[in-house]
Each structure stands twice: as C-alpha cells, then as structure tokens.
Amino acid sequence: MPFFLVQRSFAEQLDLSRDEITVLEGANLDAGIRWIEAFLTADRMQSYCLFEAPSADVIRAASAAAGMPIDSIVEVSSLLGRVAAPAG
C-alpha cells in the first residue's frame, strides 16, 4: 500500500486531547488508513503526517469527515528509516 505525506495548516494552535486523537485514529483505521507518524511545527499551526493508505482520495475523504484541513498530499515512494542519533 502506498505512503502519503499530508501537510495541514490550522487557524488556531492545534491542541488535541488523547481522546480526540483516539477518535481520529479509529476513523482512519475504519477508512483503511494507517497513521504512521505526525509532526507539529513549533507554533502548533501546521502538521505533517505520514500515512499508509489505499489512495490520496481516501485520505481526503476521511479528513473531510473528521473536519481536518489538508494543504497538500504527496505520495512518497519509500521510507528511508529513522535517524538513530543526532549528527555531530
């Protein structure tokens, strides 16, 4: 299944409770989407999320149903892994 990087911008700082995150994860799983990782910018006004999903359209539909904005979706061809320790 392909991987997608999703960029989102928020009008206000994102501050989700654990319960809200659980609801979003469940909605994603119901749509066949696996949420791999999420990153917030320091000001909490943007997020970058990595998903495994059948298609970008499935992510768009699930995001719309959850009221989550999408700025862009990019299909990524491979995962290179994680950095074990900071360089330097």
PLM features: residue spans?
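Short S/T/G/P-rich N-terminal loop/turn motif that feeds into the first structured element of a domain
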Residues: 1-30, 34-36, 41-45, 78-88
